[in-house]
Amino acid sequence: MSKVLVEAKGMGLRSTPYKLNLVADLIRGKPVSVAVMYLKFCKKKSARYISKVLKSAIANAQANYSVDVDNLYIKEVLVGKSFSLRRIHARARGKACRVYKHYGNVIIKLFERV
């Protein structure tokens, strides 16, 4: 196994960490070509965000280390919590409730298997 480890980050993605993690579970440990196909046909909105980060990681690997895409595998997909926007939701009798709009972070690490 080679020591080439490529990383790409997607910060402040407009999806909750739970929803991002549902899609991230599909591609953990898979070859990059298979993972791209999984994300292409996944109907979830978070799949688009993770797909963009994965394509960025692939581009980083090709540009910085000139590795072959067929040898790249996903080592880990880290999903975390980012900031939360607080909004006001008007309720009955002049009351108001807070609504939290949660955002998430995704970090994808790739390695080259020879």
Swiss-Prot record:
GO cellular component terms listed in the entry, alphabetical order: cytosolic large ribosomal subunit
Transmembrane spans: none
Molecular-function GO terms, alphabetical: rRNA binding; structural constituent of ribosome
Keyword set, alphabetical order: Ribonucleoprotein, Ribosomal protein, RNA-binding, rRNA-binding
UniProt keyword rRNA-binding present: yes
UniProt cross-references to InterPro entries, sorted A to Z: Ribosomal_uL22, Ribosomal_uL22_bac/chlpt-type, Ribosomal_uL22_bac/org-type, Ribosomal_uL22_CS, Ribosomal_uL22_sf
PROSITE patterns linked to this entry: RIBOSOMAL_L22 (PS00464)
Record CDD domains: Ribosomal_L22
GO biological process: translation
PANTHER family, per database record: CHLOROPLAST 50S RIBOSOMAL PROTEIN L22-RELATED (PTHR13501), LARGE RIBOSOMAL SUBUNIT PROTEIN UL22M (PTHR13501:SF8)
Functional summary from the UniProt entry: This protein binds specifically to 23S rRNA; its binding is stimulated by other ribosomal proteins, e.g. L4, L17, and L20. It is important during the early stages of 50S assembly. It makes multiple contacts with different domains of the 23S rRNA in the assembled 50S subunit and ribosome. The globular domain of the protein is located near the polypeptide exit tunnel on the outside of the subunit, while an extended beta-hairpin is found that lines the wall of the exit tunnel in the center of the 70S ribosome.
Self-association state and partner proteins as the record states: Part of the 50S ribosomal subunit.
Protein name: Large ribosomal subunit protein uL22
Organism: Ehrlichia ruminantium (strain Gardel)
Gene behind this protein: rplV
